[in-house]
Every structure is written in C-alpha cells, then in structure tokens.
C-alpha cells in the first residue's frame, strides 16, 4: 500500500470513530519531535558529560541540524496534512532554551514558518515526588488538538488526558537499544513489576495495529541510520 493510501485510510478510520473537529474539514494535528519527527539518537549520545545531569537542552536544540535525521515517513505524513490545509503543531518535552534553532530547522524542512510558542511548543516534564511527568496535555488542550502523533507512553497518556486521539509512531529499534529505555517500562529487561511487557509482547500489539492504551499504530517503514 502506498504512503498516500495509508494516510487516507488512517484518516478515514479516524473520521468514522470520533466526532469531527470544531471547524469542519480542518484538523488540528500535533506531533512529538524526538523519535517521531527527528531521529535524534546521535544528539543525545553525544551530550558532553558536563551537560548530562540534568540534560542541557540549550545545547541539544542547537545540534539537530548537524546530528539528527528526519524520519521520512513522518515527514510525508506532515506534508500531506499541510498540503490539504490542516493545522500542524509540534510539541516536545525539551525545554525551550535555544528553541529558535529547532524552529529554523523545521521551517526549512517543511517550508512553512515554524515559530516558538505559536506552532512549536516546549513542554518540559514536571518533577513530582522524584518522578518526571508529562505536561504536554496542557498545550494540547489549549490548541484544541484532534490528533497527536508520538512515540512514547507519555505522549499517549498526555493525549488521552487532553481528550485527543493518540496515534503511536513506533520508535526505531536503534533508538531503543542504543540510548534509551523503551516505553512500557524497559522491555529490553524482560517482564517484571516495573516492566510488564517484553519485546515479544510489543510485537503482538503492533501486529494488531493497536497499543496498550488503545491508541492506533501508524505504520511506517523507515530503514533508519546507516549505522
């Protein structure tokens, strides 16, 4: 199935399963950044030791042009929405220091003006009792989003909390294995109280095109980085 037909099928399913947006025919669509729009593994692997704890996102936001790759199937999806007149927003858990560099990169790639706090939002996680929790749902509510595409559990939870339809972009294997824990706990460690799902369990979910929160799985085929 071609990318265009796949996108059309996903949209058709969406239209028949939840109410239409407030403005008929026009959708407000949100996208996460890391591992959804950008394969940013190399940025996070190369953070200098003195900028790791906590992560210096002012440094991170300046490195994408040199180290990150656009995930082409997601780019095609975003361009489809743009070309058909829908509203696109980017929402990331990064902090906003030097966010203009990320905005510039997105503007260049999508050929539309991307501006911090207008269609690019930085929503750092909030620390509560020693654990970090997403704050993206607040921005999703303000934007009255219809759909949100993301790779992480926190993206799905934020969308559901905001009353937005969540759609999972499956994180690339190289991203999971080389620098970051998987969602659903750490599936690489197998099942435990903290990690209720193992890698094989995820494959069962994905084969049915559904995630553990009931979210849709957006099917993409991307070869990833050369190494």
Predicted regions and their residues:
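Boundary at the C-terminal end of the N-terminal hydrophobic targeting segment
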Residues: 19-24
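C-terminal cap/substrate-recognition subdomain and adjoining C-terminal extension
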Residues: 95-227
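Short, Lys/Arg-rich N-terminal segment immediately upstream of the first membrane anchor
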Residues: 1-3, 26
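Alpha-helical substrate-recognition element adjacent to the catalytic core
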Residues: 25-127
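Sec-dependent signal peptide recognition
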Residues: 4-12
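Compositionally biased regions
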Residues: 3-4, 18
């Amino acid at each position: 199935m071609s990318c265009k037909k796949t996108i059309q099928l996903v949209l058709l399913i969406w239209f028949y399963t939840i109410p239409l947006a407030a403005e008929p025919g026009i959708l407000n669509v949100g996208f996460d950044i890391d591992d959804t729009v950008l394969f940013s593994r190399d940025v996070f692997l190369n953070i200098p030791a003195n900028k790791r704890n906590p992560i210096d996102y002012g440094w991170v936001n300046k490195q994408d042009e040199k180290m990150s790759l656009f995930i082409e199937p997601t780019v095609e999806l975003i361009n489809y929405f743009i070309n058909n007149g829908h509203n696109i927003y980017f929402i990331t858990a990064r902090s906003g220091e030097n966010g203009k560099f990320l905005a510039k990169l997105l503007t260049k790639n999508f050929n539309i003006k991307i501006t911090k706090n207008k269609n690019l939002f930085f929503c750092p996680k909030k620390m509560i009792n020693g654990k970090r929790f997403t704050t993206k749902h607040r921005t999703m509510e303000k934007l009255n989003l219809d759909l949100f595409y993301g790779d992480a559990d926190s993206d799905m939870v934020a969308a559901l909390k905001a009353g937005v339809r969540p759609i999972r972009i499956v994180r690339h294997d190289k991203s999971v294995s080389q620098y970051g824990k998987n969602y659903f706990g750490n599936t690489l460690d197998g099942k435990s109280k903290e990690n209720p799902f193992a890698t094989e369990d995820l494959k069962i979910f994905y084969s049915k095109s559904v995630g553990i929160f009931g979210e849709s799985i957006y099917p993409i085929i991307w070869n990833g980085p050369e190494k």
